[in-house]
Amino acid sequence: MPKEKDGVIYTINLRRLYWGRRSNRAKRAVRMVREFVARHFGVEPEDVKIDNTVNNYLWSGSITKPPARVQVYVTVKTESGEEGERKVAYVTLANVKDVED
């Protein structure tokens, strides 16, 4: 698991979505991204915050034709609240020019 505040680029393969029925593929793509990040960073799926750019990219081909893969940039931060401290993963669309700076 990466250190806190270090960003990681992942390429998530969404081709498996095309095995199932056509309806709700984009919705399932969002769920797959959320579960992938939660599994790789050890956070709860509810604590994965997906940026609007990632959501728009996944829905760009309509509900039945999401992209086959997506490259995302993930950062993890610790937030404190009423329930104590918890890790939250932030997912943004990976743009290599922005990430390398």
From Swiss-Prot:
Xref: SMART domains: Ribosomal_L31e
NCBIfam families with a match to the protein in the record: PRK01192.1-1
Superkingdom of this protein's organism: Archaea
A GO term, aspect molecular function: structural constituent of ribosome
A single cellular component GO annotation: cytosolic large ribosomal subunit
HAMAP family: Ribosomal_eL31
Pfam families per record: Ribosomal_L31e (PF01198)
Keyword Ribonucleoprotein: yes
Keyword Lyase: no
InterPro entries: Ribosomal_eL31, Ribosomal_eL31_dom_sf
Keywords: Ribonucleoprotein, Ribosomal protein
Lineage of origin: Archaea, Thermoproteota, Thermoprotei, Desulfurococcales, Desulfurococcaceae
Protein name: Large ribosomal subunit protein eL31
Record-linked SUPFAM superfamilies: Ribosomal protein L31e
Gene Ontology biological process: cytoplasmic translation
Gene name for this UniProt entry: rpl31e
Family affiliation: Belongs to the eukaryotic ribosomal protein eL31 family.
Disulfide bonds: none
Coiled coil spans: none
Organism expressing this protein natively: Ignicoccus hospitalis (strain KIN4/I / DSM 18386 / JCM 14125)
